[in-house]
Amino acid sequence: MNKFKEDITKMARAKQSMDGNTAAAHVAYAYTEVAGIYPITPSSPMADSVDQWSAAGQKNIFGSKVKVVEMESEAGAAGTVHGSLATGALTTTFTASQGLLLMIPNMYKIAGEMLPSVFHVSARTVSTHALNIFGDHSDVYACRQTGFAMLAETNPQEVMDLSPVAHLAALEGKVPFINFFDGFRTSHEIQKIEKWDYEDLKEMCPMDAVEAFRKHALNPEHPTARGSHENGDVFFQHREACNKAYDALPAVVEKYMNKVNEKLGTDYGLRSEERRVGKECRSRWS
């Protein structure tokens, strides 16, 4: 998927050896103002990196440090994300497996309120009769009904290249994203990859969408009611109204993939020109 177009000049980027978790954290830090975290294998290094960078005074693309809030559990971290988004702060979290399942109640609220969050997930087996820390997609598949869009990557370079698409499409499309990749096989695989410069990430950011999101935040100067009770005469109509955003989302995702392609000379996209396509959702072994 990340082949290079011959007719596009590739932008020069710094190279660095890192794993998929670090690549996701690098992009997430750029677009995040608040991170609600709780550690769980194999996603913990993402939250740890963001916490370390914040403590060191690193700035995001908005010129501020990320405020990191560690809670008592993943359920608390998801509640932090929901509350922070409601007050107009771009908020992210990092999790996997049972940790992601604990976030599902808040995910319904975040998606239902059309709040632009990104959950970075290093996908891991959901524990059943026994604990298992290795990779499958049972955790992210359990979230399909929540209303979150899903974007997947297969290696650390794709994590670096495509994570911005999740953040930017969430902002413009008003649909939250799960950005996921295989636990351990991608999250902990160290490769020499090309990394984004924050100035390039800032250039792609739709500041008008950021401003619209902040204006929609809870504010005592212009109070609004949220989370109210609705009867059946209006609940269904209001719930269906968000379908327009989901119908428009593929075009928004493709728009930002094209922006990435313009900068990198890559050929990321949602559709293939081939007439017969086999699809897999896993890390690459070659």
Feature map (PLM): residue ranges:
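Thiamine diphosphate
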Residues: N2-A142, G147, P164, G183-F184
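Hydrophobic alpha-helical scaffolding
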Residues: A14, M18, G36, M71, ...
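Generic recognition of flexible, low-complexity loop/linker segments
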Residues: A23-A25, D267-S272
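Generic recognition of stable, solvent-exposed alpha-helical segments in well-folded globular domains
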Residues: P45, E158-D161, A251, K255
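Conformationally flexible catalytic loops at phosphate/diphosphate-handling active centers
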Residues: F62, V66, F177-L270
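Conserved small/polar residues in nucleotide/adenosyl-binding loops
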Residues: E273-C281, W285
